[in-house]
Amino acid sequence: MFIALTNDDGIQAPGLRAMYKALKEAGHTVQVVAPVTEQSAVGHAVTIALPLRVKIFAENGFQGMGVYGTPTDCVKLGLNALLDKKPDIVVSGINAGANVGPDILYSGTVSAATEAAHMGYPSLAVSYDNFKPDDIAAHARFAVEIMESMPWQSLPPRCVLNLNLPDVPMQQCKGLTLCPQTRAVWKDWYDHRTDPRGNSYWWLNGIIPPETVAEGTDRDMLTRGYATLTPLRFDFTDRETLARLQQNMDRQRQGSEDL
């Protein structure tokens, strides 16, 4: 298959390089369009007031196009202008750090995959549950196997598959599980610090409290040592509330008509 590969950690990130190598070793054709610089947690940001510039990277058996922009910029520019042809699948990752529950709202990794899905391409986001991945070659090979096993043609339009890999050696991984995303949210705090010049600044920290994580959700299963796969569809409509509001509005209208 022809795979378009991107990420949000940057084109030189170990996770992307591991995924590139695993895809190539599996016999796939791969073209990379990824940010030149770190773009973690930029969400679905798109550059609209600045030009996008491209830098070619070719080193140690790797070749790719680096974009001075966001992950979504990379996908939009790649699919519209840079790639040799339309890819069979767009893969985003491997991200350093899990993307579970509320993470998907912030994640450049998931947003890149989402943009591809919105443009009509099968897409897979891949993340690893450690912010400082070491040797993840086996995890990358596992991700490729999952990609190859998916029934892409039968998935609904604009569906994104979100794969998270546990922070354990792959031989200790308990397997792949399908699960929903957690509804638990981050508890944030900011450290107030002073730089070497005496200037004040703030540094974000946070945690998803374990006691708030429902059993069987992505954060729970990932912590237990499973790889998790969650299909995502970015329709934010709260249909239950929509129905209740509609009923309330209908009652109000009926009451007005009875006067």
From Swiss-Prot:
Family that this chain belongs to: Belongs to the SurE nucleotidase family.
SUPFAM superfamilies: SurE-like
Entry EC no(s): 3.1.3.5
Protein name in the entry: 5'-nucleotidase SurE
Cofactor list: a divalent metal cation
Gene field: surE
Source species: Oleidesulfovibrio alaskensis (strain ATCC BAA-1058 / DSM 17464 / G20) (Desulfovibrio alaskensis)
Function recorded in the entry: Nucleotidase that shows phosphatase activity on nucleoside 5'-monophosphates.
GO molecular-function terms, A-Z: 5'-nucleotidase activity; metal ion binding; nucleotide binding
